[in-house]
Amino acid sequence: MRRHVERLRETGLPPQVPYLVGLGPLRSARGARWMRDSLWGTVMPEELVRRMDQAADPAEAGIDICAELLAAAAEIPGIDGAHLMAPGHQAGIVEAVRRSGVAQAAAASSTRA
């Protein structure tokens, strides 16, 4: 994600233009493969597909992966937010946000402002 945002800025995307990443908790390796192969622009590293494939509970692994990516995105300069998507799996979004810690970090920083 970091390299992608850096390339966008180097190419001329002004810093005042907000940039959002699209994330969601996937439920299976099959779903991850489908997104990678069928949705233009989707970046799905094979290691994430493999991790879901090998998980005892792929849906839990999907929530963990989403939480990790959300936390990582929050640390990257130039990423202003995330568009979280999971049709029919809203509880997975809520849990990924909770596990990521981003809501707690945002609340803590707003109380210091």
Question: Language-model segments: which ranges?
Answer:
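Beta-sheet entry/capping signal
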Residues: P18, G81-H83
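Active-site-adjacent beta->alpha loops and helix N-cap segments on the catalytic face
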Residues: M1-G12, H89-R99
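A structural motif corresponding to the C-terminal end of an alpha-helix
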Residues: L69-G81
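Glycine-rich phosphate-binding active-site loops on the catalytic face of alpha/beta enzymes
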Residues: H83-H89
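Structured catalytic/translocation cores of nucleotide/phosphate-coupled proteins
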Residues: M1-H4, V21, G78
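Active-site pocket-lining/capping segments in soluble small-molecule metabolic enzymes
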Residues: G12-L69, G88, R99-A113
